[in-house]
Every structure is written in C-alpha cells, then in structure tokens.
Amino acid sequence: MNTRFFARTAALTAFALAPSLASAHTGLGHVDGFAHGFTHPLGGLDHVLAMVMVGLFASQLGGRARWLVPASFVSVMVLGGMLGLAGIAIPFVELGIGLSIVVLGGVVAFNLQAGVAAAMALVGFFAVFHGYAHGAEMPESASGLAYGLGFVLATAALHAAGLGCGLLLDGKESAKGALFVRSLGAVAAIAGVGVVSGLV
C-alpha cells in the first residue's frame, strides 16, 4: 500500500472522528455518556502520550503492524474497560499507565524493530491498564455502551494521529524525519518518567 495514501487516510480518520466530540454535547443520557467516554482519553496527558506512541510505533514497524498493533491495543483496552466497569480490581493501574509511556516512548526513540506478534503483545499488556482506568472512572449516570464507544473512538483517533504523523514524516524519506519521530519518542519517555515519579 502506498505510504502517502496510508498516511493521509490515517490523518483523515483522526480528523473525521474529532467532530463526534462536539455533536456528543447536544443531549443527555446515552449521548452524554459518549461525550464522557470520548473526552476521557483526551483529558489526560498520560493517555494521550501513550496512544500517540502506539501509532508512531506502528508506523515505524510498517507492513501489517500499521493496523494490527493499534487494533490489538483497542481490542485489549475494551477488555480492560469491562474489568473496570465490573469493579474487578487489578493492581498497579496507575503505575502501568505511567510505565506504558516510558516503554512505548522508549521503543519509538530507539526505533525498536520488534516482530508483529511481540509488538501486539507489548501494547496489549499496557492496554489493560488504560482500559481499566477508562472503565473504572465512568460516571454512574452514563450508559456503559455509549461511554465505551466514546473512549474507543477517541483512542482510535489518537492512534491514527500518531500513525499518520509517523507515515507522513517517513514518506519524506528524510533522515531528519526519522530522527524527529525518534525525538518525539524520547520526549514522551521522559514525560512518562515524570508521570511515574508523580512530577507530571
């Protein structure tokens, strides 16, 4: 598949999903639940950084990983969200979220060329913690289905943004572009250390 076409498609997906946030504020009930779910991943720097890093990681791996890695994150995140909604406790949620930024930022910074299965397993592991946090923090008045749809779409949009950014820079076939992507990973990893240490 043409890299430039794929990059534009990913970027357009992110922008296409964004208006859903505005329209979600036009009502209450199920729609209000969607709004809460959509804004939850966008309201925390930890979630935003990790989601974008997943997209950048997928862009660096190329091939099938471009869609399998983000898809595996979203799929496992849904399972984590169900655990959170059910009130089933899992340990070290906040630590897991913080470490996800450090690790995912690190693999982007070092341009780690992992196998597709290993990459899916890595992002899937951290997806449990992010999903759990989304589910556990759902407002009591919100519809579980609408809320879940909201945070799934927001997460997918952030993945698409990272993927599109990575592919657009890679499409320039520039060493500077690749270095910039790796620099973004390094910045995210440093921010993740701040999250884990409680400084951010």
Regions from the language model: what does each represent?
Residues N2-V200:
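Membrane metalloprotein/metal-transporter helix-bundle signature
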